[in-house]
Amino acid sequence: MALSREEIASRYSKALFAYAQDAKKLDEVHEDMNVLLQVAKENPDMLRLLSDPIIRKNQKEEFLSSFSGEFSSETKNFLEFLLEYGRFNALTEIIKAFDALYDEDKNIASGTAVSAINLDEDELNRISQAYAKKYGFKKLILTNEVDSSILGGIILKVGDRIIDGSIRTRLQQIREQLIENR
């Protein structure tokens, strides 16, 4: 039975994570994977070329070495491994799964700050630092989503937590209390 891309990503990312951790190169490999993901996004033909069964292996190896020169030996070995087993078609999923393992290991969380207006970088940083400290994260990476219907305040979505500090919700709570107290 063939493995799904998610299963492939899970297995290969765990293998890469363990390999990098054992070599004490986890941060370096993580950096390499982020660079590789960016290169793949900017050059979608790269993954098609490395996944194409018609293109000879030695041509793929030459192409791979043309952009992997700055990577750690662990990353290069892993990329050669993917090439050998024909798994480059799942590279982006593997990197995302590896990233999740890395973030979990380093106690890094990511989430969304929903606000009525666009937040600048300083505001996002202050919010993420306060939330990270309060909930025990080493680091929290927030993106901003604008939703004018919340009227004001902020709704934080981090993992399975939602902290609703919006004016809209507060007004609804006041309304419900007024109705109850009639």
From Swiss-Prot:
Ion transport is among the record's keywords: yes
PROSITE patterns: ATPASE_DELTA
Annotated disulfide bonds: none
Gene Ontology cellular component annotations, sorted alphabetically: plasma membrane; proton-transporting ATP synthase complex
GO terms for MF: proton-transporting ATP synthase activity, rotational mechanism
InterPro entries the UniProt entry points to: ATP_synth_OSCP/delta_N_sf, ATPase_OSCP/d_CS, ATPase_OSCP/dsu
Coiled coil: none
Chief location category: membrane
Subcellular location: Cell membrane
Membrane topology annotation: Peripheral membrane protein
Keywords attached to this entry: ATP synthesis, Cell membrane, CF(1), Hydrogen ion transport, Ion transport, Membrane, Transport
Keyword Membrane in annotation: yes
Family: Belongs to the ATPase delta chain family.
Quaternary organization: F-type ATPases have 2 components, F(1) - the catalytic core - and F(0) - the membrane proton channel. F(1) has five subunits: alpha(3), beta(3), gamma(1), delta(1), epsilon(1). F(0) has three main subunits: a(1), b(2) and c(10-14). The alpha and beta chains form an alternating ring which encloses part of the gamma chain. F(1) is attached to F(0) by a central stalk formed by the gamma and epsilon chains, while a peripheral stalk is formed by the delta and b chains.
PANTHER family for the chain: ATP SYNTHASE DELTA CHAIN
NCBIfam families to which the protein is assigned, alphabetical: ATP_synt_delta, PRK05758.2-2, PRK05758.2-4
Function: F(1)F(0) ATP synthase produces ATP from ADP in the presence of a proton or sodium gradient. F-type ATPases consist of two structural domains, F(1) containing the extramembraneous catalytic core and F(0) containing the membrane proton channel, linked together by a central stalk and a peripheral stalk. During catalysis, ATP synthesis in the catalytic domain of F(1) is coupled via a rotary mechanism of the central stalk subunits to proton translocation.
Protein name listed in UniProt: ATP synthase subunit delta
Organism: Lactobacillus gasseri (strain ATCC 33323 / DSM 20243 / BCRC 14619 / CIP 102991 / JCM 1131 / KCTC 3163 / NCIMB 11718 / NCTC 13722 / AM63)
Source lineage: Bacteria, Bacillati, Bacillota, Bacilli, Lactobacillales
Gene from which this protein is expressed: atpH
